[in-house]
Amino acid sequence: MDCLRFFLYLVHCMLKRTLLISLMMCAAAFSASGRYWNTGLGGVTLQHLSMQASPRSAALSGAGVADPARVSEVTRNPLAITRIQAAEFGLNQIVFGDAGADDFVSVYYGLPLGESFALSFGLEYLGYDDIEGRDENGELAAEYGAYAWAAQAGFGNRGQAFGWSVSARFAYQTIDDESTVAILADGGVIYRVMEYVSFGATITNFGYVTDSEYDGAHEAAPLALQAGVTGIVPVARIFNLQSLWEVHLSADIYRRVDMDAPEWRFGTEIAYQEFLLFRAGYALRPNTEDGFSAGIGFSFGGIIFDYGYSPRPALGDGNHYLGLGVRF
């Protein structure tokens, strides 16, 4: 056991320095023009790996990178590993509107490792029913299918003030007779000031994608940077109340490689312990419609349920996000 602790300590020290240097470079990229890493609109493949997968993240419009609540967010926010306090298994599902995909399910598992570390695992699947085909002249052709899946594993430190995490992901996508394989990595650091303010930054989907040509243009992985700050307002303490209400306020900036300007994301979570949570978010997006989102969560014993809704006004519908987790 002593040898294991010493090994984990060495890994912690090495990765801590590496992640700090890497994320400082990533933060500098936000202030740059994007000249060296902007692929142009529509220049990425496997875009589902950058959409929200958990009900909580969807309800907050993607904000809250510095305030992950549970391991249920780990497939999109590697810093969720830093919040693993007990073993948890669960799944998330997205019910798309009429113009969306047909099925998205993700399964996750988190496990504390020793006093300061944690492991996470995730598996997700996105599927479509048969899609109407068109030839080069726009005429109807044979229908074709499309699906994608990804598997990942992560490791991180659960420090009280400073935390870090890394994840590795294998992703596969098939559209008609074209397939894409990717080997990707996520990383993040978080710093908590006392118990009321936290800062976080992540880099996601960094890695290798096999050559795949669609309409003559090569597509890259959906590499993205996100940084944010969260403040926690202890309502009960301020007003000397007996109840345990808290308000979490988050503001984030997010940029994916195919964006010519960043997204600004804002989220609010009103929490009564972990028993009852109300969430709302708003995102300012440069190349598509802005929009509000909302959701709710509650827990009973070791069972946690989450729901989120993200409207899509241009399509006249929205996506429903459902999550169920069990702690043991």
Task: Please place each PLM-identified region on the residue numbering.
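Cleavable N-terminal export/targeting peptides
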Residues: M1-V44
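Subset of outer-membrane beta-barrel
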Residues: S33-F328
